[in-house]
Regions:
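Active-site helix-to-loop segments that bind/position phosphate- or nucleotide-bearing substrates
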Residues: 2-3, 55-308
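Extracellular/luminal Protease-associated
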Residues: 5-19
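A surface-exposed, charged beta-strand/loop segment in the N-terminal or early-internal portion
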Residues: 15-89
Length: 308
């Protein structure tokens, strides 16, 4: 299949034994297209970044300064606030389907959605340098995660034997799907931070670790429920045990199905801020919004929280 070069936003080289010509890499650089090399199961291994995406000095300088002032804490709280709101929204969206039919599930999902939302005001009370208050912020996120994953598990057919969210290893098929989806989301957020001129390694919510893109992990948080978790619920009904190997990694056919679903989700359009927008573009807009906040060009960072 031929694809117009100017219509390509990212090249993903998945698996081993695949070569990319130097001419193709040169063209990708000229067009500002990132080339990502990933394992057969989607885990990123290396990236070729176009020279033009090095970022502006001012944006990155302000990003580093923000770690030691209120902006760092504001951003970290905003990322968690967005995640909690979207977790609650996802549970509410599934609860609607059961109203009048499965009242016990409807009440359970509505109640737990409200419990997650009730955690959000706690973030408004957290002040101070992010290094000192990170534990408080992550504590709020953790309380929400406990409620969310326990409830979300009810959406997965019993046949899969989903044991709950497993960090970071995947010893079952559903966690394998979640991890694969997060790898896909990670590539998209990584590209968005580069286009916005940000340093993907200098985060706020997640503590620094050599070689880990902590700002990417930060900015993924608000998108996880609606870009990945929602898709996995659908895949759990579409896929079969035969799409997985004995070690719970997907087969080639399984990867094709999962890839199509996750990338298809990124290309979906939703109503956000009173207009139809593609999710992939919203991710880039959010990265740009974070950059403008850090530069002092907007008073706050508003996380992605669409209405359902």
């Amino acid at each position: 299949m031929l694809v117009p070069a100017r219509g390509v936003e990212q090249i993903l080289v998945l698996g081993s034994g695949i070569s990319v010509s130097s001419d193709a890499i040169q063209m990708a650089d000229d067009l500002g297209v990132e080339v990502v090399f990933a394992s057969y199961y989607g885990k990123p291994l290396a990236r070729l970044i176009p020279a033009s995406l090095g970022g502006t000095v001012r944006t990155r300088r302000e990003q580093y300064y923000a770690y030691n002032d209120s902006r760092g804490t504001d951003l970290a709280c905003s990322f968690v606030r967005g995640k909690l709101k979207n977790q609650a929204s996802l549970l509410k969206s599934f609860a609607k389907k059961w109203k009048g039919q499965k009242e016990d599930l409807w009440r359970e999902f509505r109640a737990n959605s409200s419990r997650i939302e009730e955690l959000i005001p706690r973030l408004d009370l957290i002040k101070g340098q992010v290094e000192l208050v990170r534990g408080e912020i992550m504590g709020v996120e953790g309380m929400g995660a406990e409620i969310y994953w326990r409830t979300w598990a009810r959406l997965i057919p019993d046949d899969w034997g989903f044991p709950g969210r497993d960090y970071p290893a995947a010893r079952d098929q559903i966690n394998s799907l979640l991890n694969f989806g997060y790898y896909v989301l990670e590539q998209e957020v990584w590209a968005a931070t580069l286009y916005a001129g940000l340093d993907p390694y200098a985060g706020f919510l997640h503590a620094d670790r050599p070689g880990k893109e902590k700002l990417v992990y930060d900015m993924m948080e608000e998108f996880r429920p609606l870009v990945v978790d929602r898709v996995v619920v659908s895949l759990a009904k579409e896929m079969r045990p035969g799409h997985f190997q004995d070690d719970c990694r997907m087969t080639k056919d399984g990867i094709k199905i999962a890839s199509s679903a996750f990338y298809g989700r990124l290309d979906e359009s939703i109503t956000y801020r009173e207009k139809r927008q593609i999710l992939r573009n919203i991710i880039r807009s959010q990265a740009s919004a974070a950059a403008t906040f850090l530069r002092g060009e907007r008073p706050c960072y508003e996380p992605f929280t669409p209405r359902w």
